[in-house]
């Protein structure tokens, strides 16, 4: 149970709560009523020798077919007075069920398959058996249970076993009145509509007006047809699976006497194919009529291009299955294939040609995204910033970066929760999902970890991959990082230090190297000398990285240099192990590029004691506290260095003024560094 915000409550002070398991518990209770003698069930479904009590509301909610049947019964006069009703192929009889409920008798479907479908309606779980899969798929299409249809399609995609299409027997009506003889030809089950011939087996193409009239009077018509659901404005071609029996017509006389598919066509509307010509005839007649069934699922197409696109979703072609030979596409005057689908001019296909990467096999919807993806394999960065020269793989990234130089990149998108600004709305949405929302819809199938965005989940999945060794250096890495690692071996270093000309594989390593080895200030100078900018020879200090036995450069003064400057770099926390050159000697070059001088010139905070410059005021305060305050005693006298306080001298003075000298002295007396200070009595001058 959780509380939700409801804007309809207003300021009246009402509360809204939502119980997420309420719907599950209701279906569970209804299922228990159905199994316990059919309590409160109002319909009895007879399948063969078995009977299944059920609730009309549940059946109508999960099946559009049952909704149409029950709606027709409510509108029928015979259903109102308790008499028998024949609604579009489903026989409803009074009595005989639990609580005097009506009965529906079903044919040509096994009780096991219908029991699985009925259990799915109450439990949302279904058992798919490969031996009865064609019958299950046919029944799901007829009942218009979209969830079961999607499950069947998913089974076809994931199963490595070739599943046979349903035979012609399964295509006949599943629900029909008792006593009605089986028809000798298959019906169209698409959208719950069935095209049936009369008792003599004669059927022809109907005009749209006749189709609408038949759909309106399907419930009261004398023909043995299924109810036509509202909203079906046309009866399509045979969309159900075709069996081998269709290849030979059971009515040769009718097939031979059928009129040919030739005639005058209107200027704007394509010709309408004859139904008998499409359903009956020899294999050659089917191809000439444009009937092209799919070899896996049995779906029928009238255009070879549509069939090829459909078979691409299965991963096979009709030629590989040996089901039917596809005719070559007809070409027009402009050289393009002509679509023979009656719906072609009115409804365009949404199927796009997908392209795959030759290196990694990733599939993209068009060539543009494929070419952009190939840049990740080549490492090419064709777009460079005209200001700083930084290169990018994509032009939009480069354009966005250029705006950062002139300050035009603002942050107009403000988070209403924390006030943080963002330059792009997608960045704001990602921030809200990640920080201010507890919902984590994307879950990992391995460790059950949940994430707010799909990108975070994709990055997390890399941790579950097994590490593989590099073929060059033998280093073990995950497959997601192996491509970037191999670039280091194939391309070599691409970022070189402008001072020592050392190469690095990435710009981040180069920045660490410059800060660590070349970002050290000069030795201390006297107050009377003019301050020297920290850039002439920034790395000439008392550090001994890279040289043997603590040796220094020959032009450095060993006397005036101070060891206290070894840790006073602007990046004092960045330390690297000792580096040696190839021949073991420490080389030094006094030539410093101009850009290095300009970057060091940005140090605009000079030390008033020694004249050294620093990039930030915090580095200057650290320098004064570590060097000048400790060396000269500072404003606190002998107590300043003894306290070892982490505060600045100004903060220490404020503490002394606030709490009094006696309190501070007694609090820090035990932490004095000099043991002689502990033994000396505090004189009056100390107070």
From Swiss-Prot:
Region described as Disordered: spans on this chain: 250-278, 332-351, 549-603
Every BTB domain range: 41-130
Positions of disulphide bridges: none
Primary location: nucleus
Phosphoserine modifications at: 282
GO cellular component: male germ cell nucleus; nucleoplasm; nucleus
Compartments it resides in: Nucleus
GO molecular function list: chromatin binding; DNA binding; DNA-binding transcription repressor activity, RNA polymerase II-specific; RNA polymerase II cis-regulatory region sequence-specific DNA binding; ubiquitin protein ligase binding; zinc ion binding
InterPro entries, A to Z: BTB/POZ_dom, HMGI/Y_DNA-bd_CS, SKP1/BTB/POZ_sf, Znf_C2H2_sf, Znf_C2H2_type
Bias (Basic and acidic residues): 549-558
Clinical note on disease: A chromosomal aberration involving PATZ1 is associated with small round cell sarcoma. Translocation t(1;22)(p36.1;q12) with EWSR1.
Subunit and partners: Homodimer. Interacts with RNF4. Interacts (via C-terminus) with TP53; this interaction inhibits TP53 ability to activate transcription.
Name of protein: POZ-, AT hook-, and zinc finger-containing protein 1
Organism: Homo sapiens
Gene: PATZ1
């Amino acid at each position: 149970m959780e509380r939700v915000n409801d804007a309809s409550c207003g300021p009246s002070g009402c509360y809204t709560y939502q119980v997420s398991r309420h719907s599950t518990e209701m279906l569970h209770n209804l299922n228990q009523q159905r199994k316990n003698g059919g309590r409160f069930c109002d319909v009895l479904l007879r399948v063969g020798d078995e009977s299944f009590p059920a609730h009309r509301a549940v059946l109508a909610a999960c099946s559009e077919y049952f909704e149409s049947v029950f709606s027709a019964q409510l509108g029928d006069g015979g259903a109102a007075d308790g008499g028998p009703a024949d609604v579009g192929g489903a026989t409803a009889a009074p009595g005989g069920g639990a609580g005097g409920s009506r009965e529906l008798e079903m044919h040509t479907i096994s009780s096991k398959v219908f029991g699985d479908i009925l259990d799915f309606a109450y439990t949302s779980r279904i058992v798919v058996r490969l031996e009865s899969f064609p019958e299950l798929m046919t029944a799901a299409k007829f009942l218009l249970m979209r969830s079961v249809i999607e499950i069947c399609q998913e089974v076809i995609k994931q199963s490595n076993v070739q599943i046979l299409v349903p035979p012609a027997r399964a295509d006949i009506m599943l629900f029909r009145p008792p006593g009605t003889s089986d028809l000798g030809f298959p019906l169209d089950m698409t959208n719950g509509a069935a095209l049936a011939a009369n008792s003599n087996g004669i059927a022809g193409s109907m005009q749209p007006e006749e189709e609408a009239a038949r759909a309106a009077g399907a419930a009261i018509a004398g023909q043995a047809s299924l109810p036509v659901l509202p909203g079906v404005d046309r009866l399509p071609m045979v969309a159900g699976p075709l069996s081998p029996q269709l290849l030979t017509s059971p009515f040769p006389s009718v097939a031979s006497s059928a009129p040919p598919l030739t005639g005058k066509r209107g200027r704007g509307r394509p010709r309408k194919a004859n139904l008998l010509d499409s359903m009956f005839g020899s294999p050659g007649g089917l191809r000439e009529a444009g009937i092209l069934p799919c070899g896996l699922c049995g779906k029928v197409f009238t255009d070879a291009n549509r069939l090829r696109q459909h078979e691409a979703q299965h991963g096979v072609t009709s030629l590989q299955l040996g089901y039917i030979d596809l005719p070559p596409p007809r070409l027009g005057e402009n050289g393009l294939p002509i679509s023979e689908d009656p719906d072609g001019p009115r409804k365009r296909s949404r199927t796009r040609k997908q392209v795959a990467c030759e290196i990694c096999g990733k599939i993209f919807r068009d060539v543009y995204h494929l070419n952009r993806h190939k840049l990740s394999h080549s490492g090419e960065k064709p777009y460079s910033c005209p200001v700083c020269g930084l290169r990018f793989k994509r032009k939009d990234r480069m354009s966005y970066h250029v705006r950062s130089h002139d300050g035009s990149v603002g942050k107009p998108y403000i988070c209403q929760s924390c006030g943080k600004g963002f330059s792009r709305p997608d960045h704001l949405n990602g921030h809200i999902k990640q920080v201010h929302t507890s919902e984590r819809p994307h879950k990992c199938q391995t460790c059950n970890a949940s994430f707010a965005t799909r990108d975070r989940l994709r990055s997390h999945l890399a941790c579950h991959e097994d590490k593989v060794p590099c073929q060059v250096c033998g280093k073990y890495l995950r497959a997601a990082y192996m491509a970037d690692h191999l670039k280091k071996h194939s391309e070599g270093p691409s970022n070189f230090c402008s001072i020592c000309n050392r190469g690095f594989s990435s710009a981040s390593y180069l920045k660490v190297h410059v800060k660590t080895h070349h970002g050290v200030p000069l030795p201390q100078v006297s107050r009377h000398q003019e301050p020297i900018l920290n850039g002439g020879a920034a790395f000439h200090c008392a550090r001994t990285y890279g040289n043997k036995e603590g040796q220094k450069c020959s032009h450095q003064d060993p006397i005036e240099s101070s060891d206290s400057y070894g840790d006073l770099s602007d990046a004092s926390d960045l330390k690297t192990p000792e580096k040696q050159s190839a021949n073991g000697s420490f080389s030094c070059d006094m030539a410093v590029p101009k850009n290095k001088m300009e970057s060091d010139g940005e140090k605009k905070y000079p030390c008033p004691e020694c004249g050294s410059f620093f990039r930030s005021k915090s580095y200057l305060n650290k320098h004064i506290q570590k060097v000048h305050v400790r060396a000269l005693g500072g404003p606190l006298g002998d107590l300043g260095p003894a306290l070892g306080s982490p505060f600045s001298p100004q903060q220490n003075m404020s503490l002394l003024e606030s709490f009094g000298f006696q309190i501070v002295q007694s609090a820090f007396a035990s932490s004095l560094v000099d043991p002689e200070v502990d033994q000396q009595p505090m004189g009056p001058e100390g107070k």
